Regions:
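Conserved phosphate-donor/acceptor-positioning beta-strand/loop module used by diverse small-molecule
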Residues: 62-86, 90-98
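Residue-level signature of catalytic and energy-coupling elements of molecular machines
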Residues: 50, 78, 126
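RNA pseudouridine synthases
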Residues: 43-46, 56-62
């Protein structure tokens, strides 16, 4: 978990405001996020769905029928996974992972005013290296079945 730097520039929190197409700000990052948030909320209100990233846990924080999961793995495991998918050296894979995680963290902090890797933001945190991808998915499925008393 990272410690917030109080000298970082202030972050913005999602308000749900949508900017209309005729506005000069329509193509802003802020407006793109707001439209993504609207779509995420609309989907979650209408049907069961799995949303990876995009601050979905924060956007849906006031909904009862949601499971917020943070799936992670030690950097050594992430490096192995990246190297299995791409022809990168260990150093290159680690650099790529750090860059992606930095972007994820900054994006999450900017729109939610929270820390991406803070376990308190999620009801379920899982180290995927312990069970592997398939068993981790089964674990999450079992959790959903127990929480909502349903059979998937």
């Amino acid at each position: 978990m990272t410690v917030p730097d109080f000298f970082d520039p202030p972050t913005r929190q999602y308000t749900g405001e949508l900017i209309p197409p005729e506005s000069n700000d329509f193509i802003s990052d802020e407006n793109l996020f707001n439209y993504q948030a609207k779509i995420i909320r609309d989907l979650a209100e209408k049907q069961s769905c799995i949303i990876v990233g995009r601050c979905a846990d924060f956007i849906l924080r006031d909904m009862d029928n949601v499971v917020d999961a943070f799936i992670w793995a030690p950097v050594t495991e992430c490096i192995k996974n990246v190297m299995a998918l791409e022809p990168l050296s260990e150093k290159e894979a680690e650099k790529k992972i750090k860059k992606i995680n930095k972007h994820r963290s900054e994006y999450y902090r900017y729109y939610s005013c929270r820390e991406w890797d803070d376990y308190r933001n999620y009801e379920l945190c899982l180290d995927s290296s312990r069970l592997g991808f398939e068993k981790s998915a089964e674990y999450i499925k079992a959790y959903v079945e127990i929480k909502f008393d349903i059979k998937l």
